Amino acid sequence: MATYAVGDLQGCLQPLKCLLERVSFNPAVDRLWLVGDLVNRGPESLETLRFLYSIRQSLVCVLGNHDLHLLAAWHNVERLKKSDTLREIIEAPDADPLFDWLRQQKLLHYDEARGIAMAHAGIPPQWTLGQALGYAAEVEEALRDDSRLKLYLDGMYGNEPNKWSKNLTGVERLRVITNYLTRMRFCTAEGKLDLKSKEGLGTAPKGYKPWFAHKGRRSRHVTIIFGHWAALEGRVDEPGIIALDTGCVWGGAMTLYNVDSGEYHRCDCADDGTLRQPAQPTTLNDHT
């Protein structure tokens, strides 16, 4: 039995299948962790979601911002933007079971035996792991509650509040939790977010750092796997931080990480998110 983690899929099914073939993934015995952003922008969002649903018993999945956007568009199609590739999912005859499965997924996963956490964007520096798990559960409960789902999905958009306070309530509280776990890149040591800057490590606004670079970060005792930040290209100079979004949908690569051995595998992607031909999977012992 092997456990693998894969970076942002964003509807790029061919590169995912390339990686699974590369490691001889067997859904009967192996496990696949997904860092979120399963859909959107790539060429096969519906097919990707259907494939994941077919092997759902083998998956551990956390939701990304694009997955939450899809759920919001499911309830209000006017949420769709021109750049979205999600309409085919909403209009699919099997949409309901796909959406019901999606809304059951987590925002934060923790494997206690391995000491590894996984979130789409990361864990803000001012939260302990226990706090992060508790706050994530608040959003997860809203997603699974039919009476609260629409209110949450309509209210989750926006950049404010840009900092956590235990006194926050209602949809504002859920929004900032969501932004930390699914949209965060740069923040201050106190957790004030900058959600506009999306480039690499050297582009931090004054007073801000990548969330994982703060020396006082309270989750340092855990290894954290995350995606979301394609501009990093998987490169972080920080022990215990595993960045897996390597920009497949932008013509980069899709990266798979063996959670137990530490080995990386990569399949290169074409500019349209399909598999670059000829397909030449790469095994990387030292991910660079």
Curated annotation (Swiss-Prot):
Cited InterPro entries: ApaH (IPR004617), Calcineurin-like_PHP_ApaH (IPR004843), Metallo-depent_PP-like (IPR029052)
Pfam families: Metallophos
Reaction equations catalysed: P(1),P(4)-bis(5'-adenosyl) tetraphosphate + H2O = 2 ADP + 2 H(+)
Top-tier EC class: hydrolase
Source domain of life: Bacteria
CDD domains per the UniProt record, alphabetical: MPP_ApaH
One Gene Ontology term of the molecular function aspect: bis(5'-nucleosyl)-tetraphosphatase (symmetrical) activity
Known EC number: 3.6.1.41
Keywords (A to Z) from UniProt: Hydrolase
NCBIfam families to which the protein is assigned, alphabetical: apaH, PRK00166.1
Family in the record: Belongs to the Ap4A hydrolase family.
Role according to the record: Hydrolyzes diadenosine 5',5'''-P1,P4-tetraphosphate to yield ADP.
HAMAP family named among the record's database cross-references: ApaH
Name used for this protein in its record: Bis(5'-nucleosyl)-tetraphosphatase, symmetrical
Annotated source species: Pseudomonas putida (strain GB-1)
The gene coding this protein: apaH
